[in-house]
Amino acid sequence: MSPSLHPLLDNGITKGDPNFPGGNLYCKCSSDKVVVKLASNVAHNHACGCSKCWKPAGSLFSIVGVVPRDAVSVTEHAEKLSIVDASAAIQRYACKGCGVHMFGRIEKDHPFKGLDFVHAELSDQKGWQEPQFAGFVSSIIEQGFHPKGMEEVRSKFHSLGLETYDALSPALMDLIATFTAQRAGVLSANL
């Protein structure tokens, strides 16, 4: 039996609506759920194999995208949120009750500061952007996945029409490199 990439991928990808306006994310608690309102659709939605992202039980990958920071608001039970790892670049706010990561925020100087990382699957609304690529694919080995299974994992992604990377997509890596070059003064800040 092949491994589960993620429930949103295992049976094919459902196309999102490019005009989707956003919606609410809910933690997995049976009562007193944390509710996070997103005032926009996600962008750069992707499967992520890193060891930091929240993943559904049995899944090798998370599905995570970004929204503008000012599009994120906690509307119910903010008191249940705590930061998972204060030393990480992305401050992941998780529910203390169920452990689900509700959003991740970057506070330090970083190419993605101003964007919050979210798991749109925590919404009961349909229309969120579908996954665009798979990132940090090799990182699942660091979490115990046998290296001999990597060809099958990459083949599954390719059969879904998703490119696989061992970092982020080229467009996002270009953004990081541009930020770094501008900070170093080798590129103009006004491109």
From Swiss-Prot:
It comes from the Eukaryota. GO terms for biological process: formaldehyde catabolic process. It holds the Pfam family GFA. The keyword Kinase does not apply. Residues 20-166 form the CENP-V/GFA domain. Its cofactor is Zn(2+). One of its GO terms (molecular function) is zinc ion binding. Zn(2+) 1 binds at residues 27, 29, 95, 98. This is Putative glutathione-dependent formaldehyde-activating enzyme. It comes from Aspergillus niger (strain ATCC MYA-4892 / CBS 513.88 / FGSC A1513).
